[in-house]
Structure formats: structure tokens, C-alpha cells
């Protein structure tokens, strides 16, 4: 069975668990699987990278994108910024100018010095695709790793049914590891490997 859309995924889950009375629960299994998938560092892959320009307020705060998972790099006018603790950043005497540092404060980034209107801040980060739903039939993760979605949802179904989900868990872990291996192979193919450390 093809696994390219939300409807096909739901139908496949129903076939695998061989139950006709869990139609209302299957979307929950998928949602729980999504939560687990995107909390896993192994899903930090190039297809989930995004670049945005950040706007700041008068105090040097910028709201983190709603689909943010983890930072890769943050630049001001093409120069990388150094991340420090919020306590350290807040101890500095306020001043305006081209930022050198940033820190995270809940759902915001704080920059120092406070950027001016002439400064451009660019964030490169890993993002979480929109959840699958009847109105969002697919996303990049389902396209890249349908087995991860399937086995992840089957693990949640096994929990719900009080059944042994170890074989589904094995399939889930195998799928994630293959996704990571494929991603690394594609990233490094034909080039000198360069590993960048991410930070949440």
C-alpha cells in the first residue's frame, strides 16, 4: 500500500492493527507519533532546514518562529553571532549597534548590542513541518520516511490496546536510523564533510 498521504497512512494503520473500531483513535496515534518523531534529534536533517530574516523590537528581542525545533546558525549582516547565557547577556550595559551575542528567553531571542534598523538578522534552523491532517495531506517527513510515521503510530496503537509493540518499536528505530544515514550520505556526497553543532 502506498504511504504518501494522510488518508493512505490512516488506512495502512487500520490494516496493520486489523481493527475496525479504532477509526476515531487513529488520528491520535498519528499525532502522538509526530510529537515523538520531531522530539528526536535524528530528525534534524537537511530537508528540514529553513532560513528566515528576524525582526527585532526596540529592546533587542525577536520572536522565535512557531515551527522552530533547533538552531543551526544565527547571523547579523552575514557574521555569525555567539550564543551566551541569558544572565550573562542581561548583565551587559544597554547599548545599540551591530549585535555580537544572543541568548534565548522563553519564545524569544535577545540580542546584544540591540540591533539597529540597518542590521539584518538571519536564522538558519530546523523546523517542524505542519502536522498531517485531512486538510494537510502530506509533509516532507512523510515523503522522506513514511515507515517512521507508520511504525511510530503503530507503537502508539499498541500502547492504547495494551499490546506488545516491540516489533513496531524496532521498525520505528530502524526507520529513524536509516533516515539519518541517508541524510548524512546525501549531505556529504561529493564534498568534504563539515559537521555543525546545533543548539535548541
Where are these regions (language model features)?
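Glycine-enriched, solvent-exposed interface loops adjoining structured elements
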Residues: 1-200
Amino acid at each position: 500500500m502506498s504511504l504518501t498521504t494522510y488518508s493512505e497512512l490512516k488506512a495502512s494503520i487500520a490494516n496493520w492493527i486489523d481493527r475496525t473500531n479504532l477509526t476515531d483513535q487513529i488520528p491520535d496515534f498519528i499525532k502522538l507519533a509526530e510529537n515523538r518523531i520531531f522530539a528526536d534529534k535524528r530528525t534534524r536533517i537537511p530537508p528540514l532546514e529553513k532560513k528566515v530574516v528576524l525582526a527585532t523590537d526596540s529592546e533587542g528581542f525577536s520572536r522565535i518562529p512557531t515551527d522552530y525545533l533547533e538552531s543551526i546558525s544565527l547571523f547579523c549582516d552575514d557574521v555569525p553571532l555567539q550564543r551566551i547565557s541569558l544572565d550573562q547577556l542581561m548583565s551587559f550595559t544597554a547599548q545599540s549597534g551591530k549585535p555580537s551575542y544572543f541568548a534565548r528567553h522563553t519564545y524569544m531571542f535577545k540580542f546584544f548590542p540591540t540591533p539597529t534598523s540597518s542590521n539584518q538578522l538571519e536564522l538558519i534552523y530546523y523546523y517542524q513541518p505542519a502536522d498531517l491532517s485531512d486538510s494537510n495531506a502530506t509533509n516532507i517527513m512523510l515523503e522522506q520516511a513514511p515507515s517512521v510515521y507508520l511504525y511510530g503510530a503503530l507503537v502508539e496503537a499498541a500502547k492504547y490496546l495494551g499490546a506488545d509493540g516491540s516489533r513496531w518499536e524496532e521498525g520505528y528505530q530502524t526507520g529513524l536510523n536509516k533516515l539519518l544515514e541517508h541524510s548524512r550520505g546525501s549531505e556529504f556526497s561529493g564534498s568534504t564533510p563539515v559537521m555543525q553543532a546545533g543548539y535548541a
